């Protein structure tokens, strides 16, 4: 884990869960909604490019992945058949999407001085029921956790109250809905971490 990459999270919380749910990664369209400059947006883009999936980063201008990384992923996509799109219109981005993925808007010890500007910029990219309704009817919601979906935690309450919101990056009704696979996603961390440990620490041919 670092600011720019979250490789293990992509292995465990994302692609394994998607494959379990849909049976395959083929033809899956994943939309990353929010700040796509950092570890989850970057790593999901790399993973989707390698897996031949359809990836869309939906973000405000200035919140997209680094151009050099995008170019590297486009080169990979040319070999795997993946597609990469970068849109600023949430409604257009999620049309027919199979997976809607988001992450918290401020993290990794970022100073409070960035909160107001960041939240104002990303507020239109909140994942809510209206947005999910524009995706494929069988779409799933994913989040690497923790999520600020209500005011029941100290930090969630602080941020929502401070900025006059009931939820931040995802609403509680979506987080708790049948479309949400966030806890299945979290469970899969254990299994893929064990696989990585077996591959790197044990004398086992996988």
What spans do the regions from the language model cover?
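C-terminal helix-to-coil terminal segments
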Residues: 160-206
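Rossmann-like adenosine-cofactor binding region
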Residues: 75-172
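Single conserved hydrophobic/aromatic residue that forms the stacking wall/gate
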Residues: 1-7, 11
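Short, well-ordered alpha-helix to beta-strand connector turns
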Residues: 7, 96-97, 178
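Active-site loop-to-helix "anion-binding N-cap" substructures in soluble metabolic enzymes
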Residues: 16-17, 47, 172, 191
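Glycine-rich phosphate/diphosphate-binding loop of Rossmann-like nucleotide-binding domains
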Residues: 20-102, 108-110
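Hydrophobic alpha-helical segments within soluble ligand-binding/sensing domains
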Residues: 12-22
